[in-house]
């Protein structure tokens, strides 16, 4: 009898015996058309699909193995993901890898996104959470597949983006690929480990060399999908790919921040003074000490984060002197006080823009005509504004930094808000803005102003004050983002007016143009080390997925979507009017579309005569929203929610149409007039500033 002494086997003989066993253990498949599913010993970032709950430990996401791990972006963002427990964002791309032998069927590229929202679709994203109100729902999708490997992605990587209504937080989803996805559908055999999981079995039963704990974990992760398949009596043998993941709750970050800050008592403002008057309103000015929550030195090359105490309340580091403005309409104040429009300026803006920012003429001069204060005053509304964090007023206070920034044409301190080099600071720059505006609003609503400051207005009591029951919030550009987040986290706004509006995220840097300079191309080339256009032209790119994992807590669409998805988790939803322009070089279409979809905005009136790729209407229709024609009121479950769109005027770009045209000014003026009268606001066909609404 021959007995082999394992301790004396030649190394080459050991290799011969061990290699097949190791290959089996890691799931090395004989069929190169299968989904790549490495339950044990991952082989590449996408070898279990992504996102997947195989990488989710109580909302702490394992991003180990992300491509190009030593590249600065990858290194910075993966480290930041690992520090937090926000979980998977509902707004990120999805990935599934197949073997090199599988070819996507030719007809997949011809399918409309809405055709994927079907139980017969070759690729499906399904809500499989039995506690979800959308259980069983399928979503419109954008689908693509890599044909060759690149710096970030392997060959045959299926890439999917849900493009309809947003996915929910704290909800379990599955991405399922059916046999018809493959060009050679009849020949494709599913991965046996995947089949076992979909049948509710432990994959160890088909591959006993998997690590037992990994196999048991995989069975647990796939159990909701196995139960869904059994309940729906679906054919497991037709499923050639599947991933399961549970979204996290990143929106809790800003909600918690506002909930705590709104309980603080703001320090009183300095004495109010009459600054100037127009025919429609008086301008009052003061100063206020705004709390600074971020630690470190501006512009936050490092640090820039907010710390929280044991009660989850943000820690105040210091204060900043902020100029503040109130405008009083030259009218008789209602008994409850003037209705008030809280205005948030945009990037590089000033508190005074609430009354100074009107029409820009061809020679570059700017008048007060059509300013928010004028539009509001004509309808009986007061306005208020503050100098925001990193805005132009703030920049002037930082003398040395201001001197340096003056040497860079078109660049301001406020542009450092989008500090993609330090994403925690980018997130918390937005959080700081939201926090200080929350507290400033509380200050304003407690004011009693001597009516002698505006003799042409009548108070009836000797003091001006503001009606807590009639408040709206308006913002331009970055201000539209803070305004939207304010309305979605702080109670009491009956209206939201967002202009030049969109999402907050990495796209604000990558899609940005500064004059004739393509800032995004420079970032791609220098920071991401890819050819310009590689990331910006490809919304499936893994850079977007990783960035969203870090910046999701500041993604305002996750907040505004609550008004439709989970109204019990948000303040009462306001009426919403959005004004967009073409071409907007600052808040571009990839940032506008998900924001508008999250609101449930219908498209008002005619779409612009631009290529379909530059339109908004098709994307809103994919999400289930409509094109309506003015007058429109109460179109979204009794609320008015709509977007109007204008072509640029030839003087300013489309980003500024609200200030360049009387039509949108007429529209949002009537929106405010209706709110003040307690009516459901109507979005009309705009014409002349200040003219009648009916």
Each language-model region and where it sits:
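N-terminal secretory signal peptides that target proteins for export/translocation
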Residues: 1-11
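C-terminal motif of bacterial Sec signal peptides marking the signal peptidase cleavage site
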Residues: 26-27
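Acidic, low-complexity Ser/Thr/Gly/Pro-rich repeat segments typical of extracellular/periplasmic
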Residues: 32-298
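Short, solvent-exposed loop/turn and secondary-structure capping segments
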Residues: 108-112, 135-138, 170-173, 184-201, ...
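C-terminal subdomain of alpha/beta-hydrolase-fold enzymes, centered on the catalytic histidine
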Residues: 159, 342, 425-432, 494-694
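Domain-level recognition of soluble alpha/beta enzyme cores
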Residues: 270-333
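Cap/lid segment of the alpha/beta-hydrolase catalytic domain
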Residues: 298-321, 333-458
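Primarily recognizes the serine-hydrolase "nucleophile elbow" in alpha/beta-hydrolase
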Residues: 449-511
């Amino acid at each position: 009898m021959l007995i082999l002494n394992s301790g004396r086997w030649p190394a080459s003989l050991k290799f011969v015996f061990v290699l097949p066993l190791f290959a089996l253990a890691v799931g090395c498949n004989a069929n190169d058309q299968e989904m790549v599913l490495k339950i044990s010993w991952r082989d590449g970032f996408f070898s279990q699909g992504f996102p997947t709950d195989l990488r989710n430990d109580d909302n702490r996401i394992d991003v180990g193995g992300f491509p190009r791990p030593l590249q600065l972006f990858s290194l910075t963002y993966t480290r930041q993901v690992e520090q937090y427990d926000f979980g998977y964002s509902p707004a990120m791309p999805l990935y599934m890898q197949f073997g090199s032998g599988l070819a996507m069927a030719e007809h997949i590229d011809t399918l409309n996104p809405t055709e994927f929202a079907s139980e017969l679709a070759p690729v499906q994203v399904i809500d499989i959470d039995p506690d979800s109100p959308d259980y069983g729902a399928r979503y419109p999708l954008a689908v693509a597949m890599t044909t060759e490997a690149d710096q970030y992605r392997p060959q045959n990587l299926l890439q999917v983006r849900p493009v309809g209504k947003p996915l929910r937080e704290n909800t379990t989803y599955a991405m399922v690929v059916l046999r018809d996805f493959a060009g050679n559908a009849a020949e494709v055999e599913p991965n046996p480990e995947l089949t076992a999981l979909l049948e509710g079995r432990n994959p160890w039963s088909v591959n006993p060399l998997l690590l037992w704990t990994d196999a048991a974990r995989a069975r647990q992760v796939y159990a909701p999908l196995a139960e869904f398949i059994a309940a729906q009596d679906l054919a497991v043998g037709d499923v050639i790919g599947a991933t399961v993941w549970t979204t996290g709750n990143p929106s809790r970050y800003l909600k918690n921040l506002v909930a705590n800050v709104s309980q603080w008592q703001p320090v009183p403002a300095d004495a109010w003074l009459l600054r100037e008057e127009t025919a429609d309103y008086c301008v009052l000015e003061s100063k206020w000490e705004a709390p600074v929550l971020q630690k470190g030195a501006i512009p936050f090359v490092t640090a820039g984060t907010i710390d929280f105490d044991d009660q989850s309340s943000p820690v105040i580091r210091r204060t900043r002197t902020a100029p503040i403005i109130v405008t009083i309409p030259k009218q008789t104040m209602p008994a409850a006080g003037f209705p008030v429009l809280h205005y948030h300026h945009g990037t590089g803006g000033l508190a005074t823009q609430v009354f100074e920012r009107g029409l820009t003429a061809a020679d570059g001069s700017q008048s007060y005509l059509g300013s928010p204060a004028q539009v509001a005053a004509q309808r009986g509304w007061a306005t208020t504004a503050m100098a925001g964090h990193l805005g132009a007023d703030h920049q002037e206070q930082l003398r040395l930094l201001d001197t340096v920034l003056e040497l860079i044409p078109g660049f301001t301190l406020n542009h450092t808000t989008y500090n993609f080099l330090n994403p925690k600071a980018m997130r918390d720059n937005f959080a700081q803005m939201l926090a200080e505006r929350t507290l400033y609003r509380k200050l304003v609503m407690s004011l009693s102003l001597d009516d002698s400051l505006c003799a042409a207005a009548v108070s009836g009591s000797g003091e001006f004050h503001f009606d807590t029951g009639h408040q709206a919030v308006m913002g331009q550009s970055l201000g539209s983002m803070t305004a939207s987040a304010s309305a979605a986290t702080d109670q009491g706004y009956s209206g939201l007016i967002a202009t030049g509006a969109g999402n907050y995220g990495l796209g604000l840097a990558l899609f940005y143009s500064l004059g004739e300079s393509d800032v995004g191309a420079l970032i791609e080339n220098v920071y991401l080390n890819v050819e310009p256009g590689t990331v910006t032209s490809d919304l499936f790119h893994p850079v977007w997925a990783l960035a969203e994992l870090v910046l999701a807590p500041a993604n305002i669409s996750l907040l505004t979507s609550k008004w439709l998805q989970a109204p019990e988790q948000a303040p009462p939803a306001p009426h919403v009017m959005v004004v967009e322009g073409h071409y907007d070089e600052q808040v571009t279409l990839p940032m506008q579309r998900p924001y508008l979809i999250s609101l449930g905005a219908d498209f008002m009136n005619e779409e612009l005569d631009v290529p379909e790729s530059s339109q908004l209407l098709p994307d809103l229709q994919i999400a289930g929203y409509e094109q309506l024609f003015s007058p429109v009121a109460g179109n979204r479950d009794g609320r008015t929610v709509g977007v109007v769109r204008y072509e640029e005027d030839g003087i300013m770009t489309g980003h500024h149409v609200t200030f360049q045209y009387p039509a949108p000014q007429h529209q949002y003026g009537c929106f405010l007039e209706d709110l003040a009268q307690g009516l459901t606001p109507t979005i009309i066909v705009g014409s002349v500033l200040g003219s009648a609404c009916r």
